[in-house]
Amino acid sequence: MTHAGHNTFMKTTLGSVRLYAILARKSAVAVVFRRGPSRNVLLIKWNTADDTFELGQWLRGRIYERRCDLSPDGDLLLYFAANYRAPLRSWSAISRPPFLKALALWPKGDGWGGGGHFQSHSRIALSH
């Protein structure tokens, strides 16, 4: 395109997307964290038996995927998230995938530690 004797090029940049999945240990369920654009995360439930996906909730913030765990049967997700805004700033929570609504919530306040893992369906170990 030419504008007033100058060559002008439009540069289109596609945002990068990162995917991270956690598989349930005793069922055909997984959760997929779709991160991007920027500070947005989408939670997706994946039925690996029939390869179907259920879109869930978006979070404007950050989920630290490597500090998350799925219950052995895939019914519950333990996650560590942050938006670094008051009042919580960061927190660990348990939800039912593909949603992030907290069934249990532990405020953290910073980015050190956080999250945890399932020892069984009804027992967790927090990293607070």
PLM region spans:
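Sequence signature of WD/YWTD-type beta-propeller architectures
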Residues: T2-H128
